[in-house]
Amino acid sequence: VGTILADIKNNGDERMSDSTVYSYIKALKEIFVIEDSIAWNPNLRSKTAIRTSDTRYFIDSSIATAALGIGPKDLINDMETFGFIFETLAVRDLRIYSDALDGKVYHYRDKNNLECDAVVHLRNGSYGLVEVKIGGSELIREGAESLKALSSKIDSTKMKTPSFLMVLTGIGDFAYKRPEDGVLVVPIGCLRP
């Protein structure tokens, strides 16, 4: 809520209270416009502080594009915004497919800004780490490195190791496993429950 209030104040409206923002968020959740992704709190070898605030997503990424008044050409010209919109779409798809497997999707971020866009967690304790990237070899490499860094911090004496590490991309015709590290690279169109 603090971030939302800061954004509102930066846009010139200082009259909105915390309770008003909370009531709007509650209403948007009730009509299925937004959904929170809860922070994942694994057992780590280090004592790194984990950020436990929820990440809020539009249930349908087209709501964000409509609210911003942008279309495909605008997104092509603003790849940063396109990346945020694509992440919303990807997390929504992961939630739908995870739900079919009686699973949940979380997110992870620590004080050192090591993050994981999605942690797909099943009831049997199995989980996978997912980094969402539009595509391109450099972004895929960055995503794989981030996933491997997080995976290496997990204390496998206290919990299972990840079942998979996956970079979920917006482009590509087929999924593959990187030979150098076993990280899966999966186009969003290849996802299935």
Model-derived regions, located:
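Switch/connector loops and helix/strand junctions flanking conserved nucleotide-binding motifs
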Residues: 66, 139-141, 174-178
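Active-site ExK catalytic segment of metal-dependent nucleases
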Residues: 127-138
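Accessory nucleic acid-recognition modules appended to NTPase machines
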Residues: 1-126
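Active-site-adjacent loop/helix micro-motif of nuclease/hydrolase catalytic cores
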Residues: 136-147
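Short beta-strand/turn micro-motifs composed of small residues
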Residues: 109, 167-169
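Arginine/glycine-rich "motif VI" loop of SF2 helicases in the C-terminal RecA-like domain
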Residues: 97-100, 148-161
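Short glycine-/polar-rich loops that comprise or flank the Walker A/P-loop
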Residues: 125-127, 160-164
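Domain-level recognition of nuclease-like catalytic cores that cleave nucleotide substrates
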Residues: 170-193
